[in-house]
Amino acid sequence: MAAVARTLLRLLGRVPIALLLLVVAAAGCRDADAQAVSYRVIVNAQNPVAQLKRDDVSRLFLKKVVNWKTGAEVQPVDQAQDSPVRRSFTKDIHKKDVEQIKGYWQQLIFTGQGAPPIEKGSDDEVVAFVAKTPAAIGYVSSTAALGSAVRTVQILP
């Protein structure tokens, strides 16, 4: 075991420290970029909701609350699982990562107790869905073009 450790140290000694630091820094930047994607929650312009608590948004997307106060059935729409905006939204709103939420839905599907929100592949697709669906709620990157048929909901702590 000691011989393996000495060999490893000898090999690592040959790797320039600057290269090692560069690799670590690059990995850190990639993770920081994934977390730094800002988003906004949107609803159809006909929806009277102007603000929601973070926990309420989570309950809507996890389908723990299935109706708006008007009685209309909530139609949440997610982004693709691998999208940076979904990672940011999931971490901020659900306080979990995408894989944990995927596990939540797999359990509900397996037990016949629910199905996940529909997924769209881009901000434009989410905006289009919310624009034509009065009871929809979605999220898009903060730079997405919204148009007049959707509006942003303020998220409260």
Task: Label each PLM-derived region with a short phrase.
Residues 5, 21, 142-145:
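Residue-level detector of alpha-helix boundary/anchor positions
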Residues 2-19:
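Bacterial N-terminal signal peptides that target proteins for export
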Residues 1-4, 26-28:
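Intrinsically disordered low-complexity regions specifically enriched for long asparagine
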Residues 18-31:
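C-terminal segment of classical bacterial N-terminal signal peptides
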Residues 32-157:
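Exported/periplasmic ABC-transporter solute-binding proteins
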